[in-house]
């Protein structure tokens, strides 16, 4: 995500300043960084799987096999996540918010549909949930790249621009590191929370996993507004129109909060049927509903943070 955000900021500013060569260089280098980073991250995840799941997270004995399977399958799709995020960032930077939004929504919807198919129809359990996520990410990565190739062929990565990897790579990392640190802190917090949830047993773990899926749907508006404002602000900053960027930011905050509150109300009204889509019942459903109902009262704060 941080690499995609970095290329979005860089390309948007270059686009606003009409620096065509810099646009090509940053795009080409960003894909190179994504491929290299995915190799190292995938290897690190495979090596860390056992100590993280069995040690730090202290997964219950009866769930360790499923936890390992989910983690390893999900880690195998890291390359698709990074490539999709880079392409997504390029589309956003170019001002194609509609195309970027469509692929974001398709990815989320496909993930939910495949979850239902793999879990409810084929009874694949958590392995099916992981496979659904990876397939959705792979489909989005391929489809978005083909879209980029068809609509904006000039924005495709080109080998002759890789010579600029030092300068553009340093810029992309400088833009990505703050977002990377924020994401890292959130991830550490998530791991600590997951460890605490694991201590309450299988019903809490199953309920929390289902709740996260519904939460992802509730977060789509804030992610969409983030898509719009980051590109809008980047292009205007590149064109030295700072007042316009500030007005856009304030308007986006207002719209994002209002829509997030509306979605929270809908989720609170239909929380039980939404959670039952993921085949949870009894105590797992009760705990998921309790967690989701509390979370929905504060989802608007996440919208402000994302924007």
What is each model feature region?
Residues 133, 142-186:
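Interhelical loop/hinge segments that connect adjacent transmembrane helices in multipass membrane
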Residues 61-84, 216, 282-305:
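Alpha-helical transmembrane segments of multi-pass membrane proteins
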Residues 1-42, 81-100, 207-271, 305-307:
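Small-residue-rich hydrophobic transmembrane alpha-helices
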Residues 34, 74, 100, 104, ...:
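Residue-level signature of transmembrane alpha-helical cores of multipass secondary-active transporters
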Residues 108-142, 271-273, 286:
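Membrane-interface helix-loop junctions in multi-pass transport and translocation proteins
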């Amino acid at each position: 995500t941080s690499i995609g955000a970095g290329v979005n900021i860089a390309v948007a500013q270059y686009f606003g300043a009409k620096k065509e060569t810099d646009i090509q260089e940053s795009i080409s280098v960003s894909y190179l960084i994504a491929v290299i980073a995915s190799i190292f991250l995938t290897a690190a995840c495979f090596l860390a799987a056992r100590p993280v799941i069995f040690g730090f997270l202290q997964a219950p004995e009866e769930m360790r096999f499923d936890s390992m399977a989910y983690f390893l399958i999900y880690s195998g799709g890291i390359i698709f996540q990074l490539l999709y995020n880079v392409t997504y960032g390029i589309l956003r930077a170019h001002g194609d918010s509609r195309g970027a939004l469509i692929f974001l929504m398709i990815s989320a919807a496909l993930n939910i549909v495949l979850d239902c198919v793999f879990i409810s129809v084929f009874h694949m359990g958590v392995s099916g949930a992981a496979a659904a996520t990876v397939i959705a990410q792979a489909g989005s990565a391929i489809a978005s790249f083909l879209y980029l190739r068809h609509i904006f062929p000039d924005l495709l990565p080109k080998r002759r621009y890789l010579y600029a990897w030092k300068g553009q790579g340093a810029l992309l990392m400088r833009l990505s590191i703050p977002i990377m640190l924020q994401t890292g802190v959130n991830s550490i917090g998530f791991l600590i929370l997951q460890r605490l949830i694991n201590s309450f047993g299988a019903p809490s773990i199953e309920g929390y996993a289902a709740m996260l899926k519904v939460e992802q749907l509730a977060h789509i508006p804030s992610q969409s507004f983030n898509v719009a404002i980051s590109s809008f602000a980047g292009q205007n900053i590149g064109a030295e129109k700072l007042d316009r960027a500030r007005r856009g930011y304030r308007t986006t905050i207002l719209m994002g909060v209002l829509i997030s509150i509306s979605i929270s109300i809908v989720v609170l009204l239909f929380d039980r049927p939404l959670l039952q889509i993921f085949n949870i019942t009894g105590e797992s459903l009760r705990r998921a509903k309790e967690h989701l109902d509390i979370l929905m009262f504060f989802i608007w704060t996440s919208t402000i943070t994302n924007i």
